Amino acid sequence: MPTINQLVRKERKKVTVKSKSPALKECPQRRGVCTRVYTTTPKKPNSALRKVAKVRLTSGFEVISYIGGEGHNLQEHSIVLVRGGRVKDLPGVKYHIVRGALDTAGVAKRTVARSKYGAKRPKAGAAAAAKK
């Protein structure tokens, strides 16, 4: 424990918290333009073709973002909304593309966890028919 004299000479060091999504610059989401849309493979022990896009954000950063859900309509020059959130098995992917916002379509025929994938609520008759 330091003495008062030691604290006068050198004050306590502030703990700095490093951002997990620096490209967003303290914003909840950022708009960007897709520069490349492609698939990549996850690290061991997983195996798949994960859909990702390289996005140039309005903040000036170029980041790799994950496209969640089954199927997408993104291509080069699509305008997308990017949020934070990493993908554990894809190194370097620290952002997600928001489905159902700007040029990104929501996931078709999605009935569970719809808000996460930009899917509209199905009609009452359509939902009953899908269950049977």
Curated annotation (Swiss-Prot):
Function per UniProt: With S4 and S5 plays an important role in translational accuracy.
The gene coding this protein: rpsL
Keyword Ribosomal protein: yes
Entry-annotated residues carrying 3-methylthioaspartic acid: D89
UniProt-recorded name of the protein: Small ribosomal subunit protein uS12
Family of this protein: Belongs to the universal ribosomal protein uS12 family.
Molecular functions per Gene Ontology: rRNA binding; structural constituent of ribosome; tRNA binding
Pfam families noted in UniProt: Ribosom_S12_S23
Superkingdom, natural source: Bacteria
PANTHER family per record: 30S RIBOSOMAL PROTEIN S12 FAMILY MEMBER (PTHR11652)
One annotated GO biological process: translation
CDD domains: Ribosomal_S12 (cd03368)
Protein keywords: Methylation, Ribonucleoprotein, Ribosomal protein, RNA-binding, rRNA-binding, tRNA-binding
Quaternary data: Part of the 30S ribosomal subunit. Contacts proteins S8 and S17. May interact with IF1 in the 30S initiation complex.
InterPro entries: NA-bd_OB-fold, Ribosomal_uS12, Ribosomal_uS12_bac
Keyword Transmembrane: no
GO CC aspect terms: small ribosomal subunit
